[in-house]
Amino acid sequence: MGLSLLAGCDNEKQQIFKEAEKDLEQGSYEYALDEFTTSVNNGVKPAVSYRGIGICQLRLGNYDDAITAFTSALGEEKVNKSMARDLYLYRATARLQAGYLDDAMADCQVLAQNYEMDADAWFLTGKVALEMDGYDEAASDFEQAYGEDSSYDRAIQIYETYLNKDMEADGTRYLEAVLSTEAK
């Protein structure tokens, strides 16, 4: 009897975790945050639960709390290489949003040294570099990002990043490039 009660308890804990994932996917960040926090307290997939907390906090604009959650997730034992890469991307994003530019760049450097860089990683690194007034590094990183993903959405992202720094001319060439390839 005691064993069946424990099994029921575990099922309930797993159900809370599954609800958290569903709520996160649907954009119900407050609900997901509560459920992921409960999952951490219940010991259910701590690394994934901390990641969920971090994403919720990031979406809610609570950047310091997001950074703490991503750092906690990185400190967990069961973090594979793919998840660690994902966590560094999220933490760098939260650090950038919070204005911790040196820390954001440190995460970007960890990504570049230890993980496969894709368009998202290059774009984020360029965005951090531009915020730090590293114009040449940003230009190089954006070139890499656009080389990996020359979509209209990526061109708009790069353009808007330059526009936000009053450097519209630097971003316009990405729009021109994507429009010229779509016109063919």
Predicted regions and their residues:
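Residue-level recognition of tetratricopeptide repeat
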Residues: 21, 55, 93, 127, ...
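Canonical tetratricopeptide repeat
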Residues: 52, 86, 90, 124, ...
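Alpha-helical adaptor scaffolds
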Residues: 55-58, 72-114, 120
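Helix-start (N-cap) detector for alpha-helical repeat units in TPR-like alpha-solenoids
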Residues: 13-14, 47-48, 81-85, 119-120, ...
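Terminal, low-structured helical/coil segments at or just beyond the last alpha-helical repeat
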Residues: 149-184
